[in-house]
From Swiss-Prot:
GO terms for molecular function: DNA binding; DNA-binding transcription factor activity. Belongs to the LysR transcriptional regulatory family. Involved in anaerobic NO protection. It comes from the Bacteria. This is HTH-type transcriptional regulator YidZ.
Length: 319
Protein backbone atom coordinates (compact mmCIF):
# COMPACT_ATOMS: atom_id res chain seq x y z
CA UNK A 1 0.00 0.00 0.00
CA UNK A 2 1.29 3.46 -0.91
CA UNK A 3 2.39 5.44 2.14
CA UNK A 4 1.32 9.04 2.66
CA UNK A 5 3.89 11.75 3.26
CA UNK A 6 1.56 13.25 5.85
CA UNK A 7 2.34 10.27 8.09
CA UNK A 8 6.10 10.85 8.01
CA UNK A 9 7.99 13.20 10.32
CA UNK A 10 10.08 15.22 7.84
CA UNK A 11 12.81 15.61 10.46
CA UNK A 12 13.53 11.95 9.82
CA UNK A 13 14.64 12.82 6.27
CA UNK A 14 17.13 15.34 7.64
CA UNK A 15 18.43 12.64 9.97
CA UNK A 16 18.71 10.26 7.02
CA UNK A 17 20.71 12.74 4.96
CA UNK A 18 23.13 13.42 7.81
CA UNK A 19 23.61 9.71 8.39
CA UNK A 20 24.42 9.32 4.70
CA UNK A 21 26.96 12.15 4.89
CA UNK A 22 28.59 11.19 8.20
CA UNK A 23 28.21 7.39 8.13
CA UNK A 24 28.08 7.61 11.92
CA UNK A 25 25.22 7.85 14.42
CA UNK A 26 27.41 9.82 16.83
CA UNK A 27 28.53 12.37 14.24
CA UNK A 28 25.01 12.79 12.87
CA UNK A 29 23.73 13.34 16.41
CA UNK A 30 26.36 16.03 16.99
CA UNK A 31 25.31 17.91 13.84
CA UNK A 32 21.64 17.67 14.85
CA UNK A 33 22.43 18.69 18.44
CA UNK A 34 20.67 15.61 19.82
CA UNK A 35 21.82 12.45 21.56
CA UNK A 36 23.03 9.36 19.65
CA UNK A 37 20.10 7.50 21.21
CA UNK A 38 17.67 9.91 19.53
CA UNK A 39 19.33 9.33 16.15
CA UNK A 40 19.20 5.56 16.67
CA UNK A 41 15.46 5.79 17.38
CA UNK A 42 14.98 7.90 14.24
CA UNK A 43 16.90 5.33 12.21
CA UNK A 44 14.66 2.58 13.57
CA UNK A 45 11.58 4.53 12.41
CA UNK A 46 13.13 5.05 8.98
CA UNK A 47 13.93 1.36 8.67
CA UNK A 48 10.31 0.53 9.46
CA UNK A 49 9.03 3.13 6.98
CA UNK A 50 11.20 1.94 4.10
CA UNK A 51 11.17 -1.73 5.16
CA UNK A 52 14.94 -1.83 4.66
CA UNK A 53 17.98 -1.71 7.00
CA UNK A 54 19.22 1.42 5.11
CA UNK A 55 22.65 1.10 6.77
CA UNK A 56 24.72 -1.80 8.08
CA UNK A 57 27.53 -1.56 10.60
CA UNK A 58 31.10 -2.09 9.34
CA UNK A 59 34.54 -1.50 10.91
CA UNK A 60 34.71 1.73 8.88
CA UNK A 61 31.30 3.01 9.96
CA UNK A 62 27.80 2.76 8.55
CA UNK A 63 27.59 1.39 5.01
CA UNK A 64 24.46 2.25 2.98
CA UNK A 65 22.33 -0.50 1.52
CA UNK A 66 21.55 -0.50 -2.23
CA UNK A 67 18.17 1.11 -1.51
CA UNK A 68 19.84 3.91 0.46
CA UNK A 69 22.36 4.49 -2.31
CA UNK A 70 19.54 4.70 -4.86
CA UNK A 71 17.78 7.34 -2.74
CA UNK A 72 20.85 9.50 -2.06
CA UNK A 73 20.46 11.88 -5.02
CA UNK A 74 16.70 12.30 -4.55
CA UNK A 75 17.22 12.98 -0.86
CA UNK A 76 19.88 15.62 -1.57
CA UNK A 77 17.58 17.28 -4.12
CA UNK A 78 14.71 17.28 -1.62
CA UNK A 79 16.86 18.95 1.04
CA UNK A 80 18.27 21.50 -1.39
CA UNK A 81 14.77 22.52 -2.50
CA UNK A 82 13.73 22.80 1.13
CA UNK A 83 16.69 25.05 1.91
CA UNK A 84 15.87 27.24 -1.09
CA UNK A 85 12.24 27.51 0.01
CA UNK A 86 13.21 28.53 3.53
CA UNK A 87 15.76 30.98 2.11
CA UNK A 88 13.16 32.86 0.02
CA UNK A 89 12.94 35.86 2.41
CA UNK A 90 16.72 36.28 2.20
CA UNK A 91 16.50 36.97 -1.51
CA UNK A 92 14.47 40.09 -0.65
CA UNK A 93 16.40 41.15 2.46
CA UNK A 94 19.54 38.99 2.37
CA UNK A 95 21.04 38.44 5.80
CA UNK A 96 23.59 35.78 6.62
CA UNK A 97 23.66 34.48 3.05
CA UNK A 98 26.42 31.90 2.51
CA UNK A 99 28.49 31.45 -0.63
CA UNK A 100 30.43 28.19 -0.88
CA UNK A 101 32.82 27.81 -3.80
CA UNK A 102 35.33 25.21 -4.96
CA UNK A 103 37.91 26.67 -7.31
CA UNK A 104 41.25 25.94 -8.87
CA UNK A 105 44.14 27.91 -7.46
CA UNK A 106 45.68 30.24 -8.66
CA UNK A 107 42.59 31.00 -10.76
CA UNK A 108 40.63 32.02 -7.68
CA UNK A 109 43.58 34.01 -6.31
CA UNK A 110 43.51 36.24 -9.40
CA UNK A 111 39.86 37.17 -9.07
CA UNK A 112 38.95 36.54 -5.42
CA UNK A 113 39.56 40.09 -4.18
CA UNK A 114 37.26 41.57 -6.84
CA UNK A 115 34.68 38.79 -6.46
CA UNK A 116 34.48 39.10 -2.68
CA UNK A 117 34.04 42.88 -2.99
CA UNK A 118 31.12 42.36 -5.36
CA UNK A 119 29.52 39.79 -3.06
CA UNK A 120 29.80 42.04 0.01
CA UNK A 121 28.54 45.04 -1.93
CA UNK A 122 25.39 43.17 -2.94
CA UNK A 123 25.04 41.05 0.22
CA UNK A 124 26.75 43.01 3.04
CA UNK A 125 26.21 40.31 5.67
CA UNK A 126 27.18 37.38 3.47
CA UNK A 127 29.81 34.82 4.43
CA UNK A 128 32.13 33.22 1.86
CA UNK A 129 33.81 29.83 2.06
CA UNK A 130 36.30 28.83 -0.63
CA UNK A 131 37.88 25.39 -0.91
CA UNK A 132 40.47 24.15 -3.39
CA UNK A 133 39.07 22.10 -6.23
CA UNK A 134 39.88 18.43 -5.63
CA UNK A 135 38.72 14.92 -6.45
CA UNK A 136 35.65 15.28 -4.19
CA UNK A 137 34.42 18.65 -5.46
CA UNK A 138 31.90 17.29 -7.96
CA UNK A 139 30.39 15.12 -5.24
CA UNK A 140 30.34 18.13 -2.90
CA UNK A 141 28.31 20.05 -5.50
CA UNK A 142 25.94 17.09 -5.78
CA UNK A 143 25.60 16.86 -1.99
CA UNK A 144 24.77 20.56 -1.80
CA UNK A 145 27.92 21.42 0.15
CA UNK A 146 29.29 23.64 -2.66
CA UNK A 147 27.24 26.20 -4.59
CA UNK A 148 29.47 26.45 -7.62
CA UNK A 149 32.79 25.09 -8.87
CA UNK A 150 35.30 26.78 -11.16
CA UNK A 151 38.00 24.62 -12.68
CA UNK A 152 39.62 23.36 -15.86
CA UNK A 153 38.59 20.18 -17.63
CA UNK A 154 40.48 18.32 -20.36
CA UNK A 155 40.08 17.81 -24.11
CA UNK A 156 42.17 14.70 -24.77
CA UNK A 157 39.86 11.97 -26.15
CA UNK A 158 41.09 9.45 -23.55
CA UNK A 159 40.76 11.80 -20.58
CA UNK A 160 38.43 11.06 -17.69
CA UNK A 161 37.92 14.82 -17.27
CA UNK A 162 35.99 15.50 -20.48
CA UNK A 163 32.97 17.79 -20.20
CA UNK A 164 30.92 15.07 -21.88
CA UNK A 165 31.65 12.75 -18.94
CA UNK A 166 30.27 15.07 -16.26
CA UNK A 167 27.41 13.58 -14.20
CA UNK A 168 23.97 14.25 -15.68
CA UNK A 169 23.01 16.22 -12.57
CA UNK A 170 25.81 18.76 -13.16
CA UNK A 171 25.24 21.77 -15.39
CA UNK A 172 28.14 23.86 -16.71
CA UNK A 173 29.28 26.90 -18.67
CA UNK A 174 32.69 27.23 -20.35
CA UNK A 175 34.04 30.71 -19.61
CA UNK A 176 37.29 30.51 -21.55
CA UNK A 177 39.73 27.99 -23.00
CA UNK A 178 43.45 28.00 -22.42
CA UNK A 179 46.57 26.06 -23.31
CA UNK A 180 49.24 24.91 -20.86
CA UNK A 181 52.62 26.60 -21.20
CA UNK A 182 56.02 25.76 -19.78
CA UNK A 183 57.30 27.96 -16.95
CA UNK A 184 61.01 28.33 -16.17
CA UNK A 185 62.87 30.70 -13.91
CA UNK A 186 64.59 33.57 -15.69
CA UNK A 187 68.11 32.09 -15.49
CA UNK A 188 67.13 28.49 -16.31
CA UNK A 189 69.77 26.77 -18.50
CA UNK A 190 67.08 25.55 -20.92
CA UNK A 191 66.61 29.15 -22.04
CA UNK A 192 70.12 29.06 -23.52
CA UNK A 193 69.25 26.05 -25.70
CA UNK A 194 67.07 25.58 -28.75
CA UNK A 195 63.50 25.25 -27.49
CA UNK A 196 62.33 21.88 -28.76
CA UNK A 197 60.95 18.59 -27.44
CA UNK A 198 64.38 17.25 -26.49
CA UNK A 199 65.12 20.34 -24.40
CA UNK A 200 61.67 20.16 -22.80
CA UNK A 201 62.24 16.54 -21.76
CA UNK A 202 65.88 16.92 -20.77
CA UNK A 203 65.05 18.63 -17.48
CA UNK A 204 63.14 17.35 -14.43
CA UNK A 205 59.48 18.33 -14.21
CA UNK A 206 57.14 19.55 -11.52
CA UNK A 207 53.71 17.96 -11.87
CA UNK A 208 50.51 18.46 -9.93
CA UNK A 209 48.32 15.83 -8.35
CA UNK A 210 45.04 16.38 -10.19
CA UNK A 211 41.90 14.43 -9.35
CA UNK A 212 44.12 11.94 -7.44
CA UNK A 213 46.45 11.43 -10.42
CA UNK A 214 50.05 12.59 -10.94
CA UNK A 215 49.68 12.48 -14.72
CA UNK A 216 47.30 14.21 -17.12
CA UNK A 217 46.68 14.82 -20.83
CA UNK A 218 50.24 16.09 -21.36
CA UNK A 219 51.57 12.67 -20.42
CA UNK A 220 49.05 10.98 -22.74
CA UNK A 221 50.26 13.10 -25.67
CA UNK A 222 53.89 12.29 -24.86
CA UNK A 223 53.04 8.59 -24.65
CA UNK A 224 51.50 8.76 -28.13
CA UNK A 225 54.86 10.14 -29.32
CA UNK A 226 56.77 7.36 -27.58
CA UNK A 227 58.25 9.84 -25.11
CA UNK A 228 57.99 10.42 -21.39
CA UNK A 229 58.91 13.22 -19.01
CA UNK A 230 60.74 12.74 -15.71
CA UNK A 231 58.44 13.91 -12.92
CA UNK A 232 60.79 14.77 -10.08
CA UNK A 233 58.28 16.60 -7.88
CA UNK A 234 54.50 16.37 -7.46
CA UNK A 235 52.59 19.16 -5.73
CA UNK A 236 48.93 19.83 -4.90
CA UNK A 237 48.33 22.61 -7.44
CA UNK A 238 49.60 25.12 -9.99
CA UNK A 239 50.21 27.78 -7.35
CA UNK A 240 52.79 25.62 -5.58
CA UNK A 241 54.35 24.40 -8.82
CA UNK A 242 54.93 27.96 -10.07
CA UNK A 243 56.43 28.98 -6.73
CA UNK A 244 58.86 26.06 -6.83
CA UNK A 245 59.77 26.66 -10.48
CA UNK A 246 60.80 30.21 -9.55
CA UNK A 247 63.24 29.10 -6.83
CA UNK A 248 67.02 29.14 -7.47
CA UNK A 249 69.55 26.31 -7.43
CA UNK A 250 67.60 23.69 -9.36
CA UNK A 251 66.61 22.93 -12.97
CA UNK A 252 62.96 22.01 -12.39
CA UNK A 253 60.36 23.23 -14.86
CA UNK A 254 56.59 23.53 -14.47
CA UNK A 255 53.69 23.25 -16.89
CA UNK A 256 50.63 25.36 -16.10
CA UNK A 257 47.87 27.22 -17.97
CA UNK A 258 48.86 30.40 -19.74
CA UNK A 259 46.44 32.46 -17.63
CA UNK A 260 48.95 31.97 -14.80
CA UNK A 261 50.90 34.90 -16.23
CA UNK A 262 48.42 37.14 -14.36
CA UNK A 263 49.21 35.31 -11.12
CA UNK A 264 52.95 35.56 -11.76
CA UNK A 265 52.70 39.30 -12.41
CA UNK A 266 50.63 39.75 -9.27
CA UNK A 267 53.27 38.01 -7.14
CA UNK A 268 56.29 39.12 -9.21
CA UNK A 269 57.59 35.59 -9.74
CA UNK A 270 60.78 35.55 -11.87
CA UNK A 271 59.42 33.14 -14.47
CA UNK A 272 59.60 32.95 -18.25
CA UNK A 273 56.92 31.18 -20.33
CA UNK A 274 57.55 29.01 -23.36
CA UNK A 275 54.94 27.23 -25.52
CA UNK A 276 54.83 23.47 -25.42
CA UNK A 277 57.01 22.18 -28.30
CA UNK A 278 54.14 20.32 -29.96
CA UNK A 279 52.33 20.64 -33.27
CA UNK A 280 48.82 22.11 -33.63
CA UNK A 281 47.05 18.74 -33.47
CA UNK A 282 48.86 17.77 -30.27
CA UNK A 283 48.14 21.15 -28.67
CA UNK A 284 44.47 20.79 -29.51
CA UNK A 285 44.36 17.70 -27.29
CA UNK A 286 45.76 19.81 -24.44
CA UNK A 287 43.19 22.61 -24.65
CA UNK A 288 41.72 23.29 -21.20
CA UNK A 289 38.12 24.57 -21.05
CA UNK A 290 37.80 26.52 -17.80
CA UNK A 291 34.32 25.87 -16.63
CA UNK A 292 31.72 26.89 -14.07
CA UNK A 293 29.88 23.88 -12.65
CA UNK A 294 26.73 23.74 -10.54
CA UNK A 295 23.91 21.32 -9.76
CA UNK A 296 20.90 21.50 -12.06
CA UNK A 297 18.62 22.03 -9.09
CA UNK A 298 20.36 25.42 -8.69
CA UNK A 299 19.97 26.53 -12.30
CA UNK A 300 17.27 29.05 -11.33
CA UNK A 301 18.48 29.81 -7.81
CA UNK A 302 18.82 33.64 -7.76
CA UNK A 303 21.99 33.50 -5.67
CA UNK A 304 23.70 31.06 -8.03
CA UNK A 305 22.52 32.89 -11.17
CA UNK A 306 23.94 36.16 -9.84
CA UNK A 307 27.21 34.48 -8.79
CA UNK A 308 27.65 32.92 -12.23
CA UNK A 309 27.14 36.28 -13.90
CA UNK A 310 29.61 37.97 -11.53
CA UNK A 311 32.33 35.38 -12.19
CA UNK A 312 31.68 35.50 -15.92
CA UNK A 313 32.12 39.29 -15.98
CA UNK A 314 35.30 39.13 -13.89
CA UNK A 315 36.81 36.50 -16.19
CA UNK A 316 36.30 38.69 -19.22
CA UNK A 317 37.95 41.58 -17.40
CA UNK A 318 40.82 39.85 -15.58
CA UNK A 319 41.79 36.76 -17.58
Amino acid sequence: MKKSLTNLDLNLLLCLQLLMQERSVTKAAKRMNVTPSAVSKSLAKLRAWFDDPLFVNTPLGLAPTPLMVSMEQSLADWMQMGNQLLDKPHHQTPRGLKFELAAESPLMMIMFNSLSQQIYQRYPQATIKVRNWDYDSLEAITRGEVDIGFTGRESHPRSRELLSLLPLAIDFEVLFSDLPWVWLREDHPALREAWDLDTFLRYPHISICWEQSDTWALDDVLQEMGRKRHIALSLPGFEQSLFMAAQPDHTLIATAPRYCQHYNQLHQLPLVARPLPFDAQQREKLMVPFTLLWHKRNSHNPKIVWLRQAINTLCRRLI
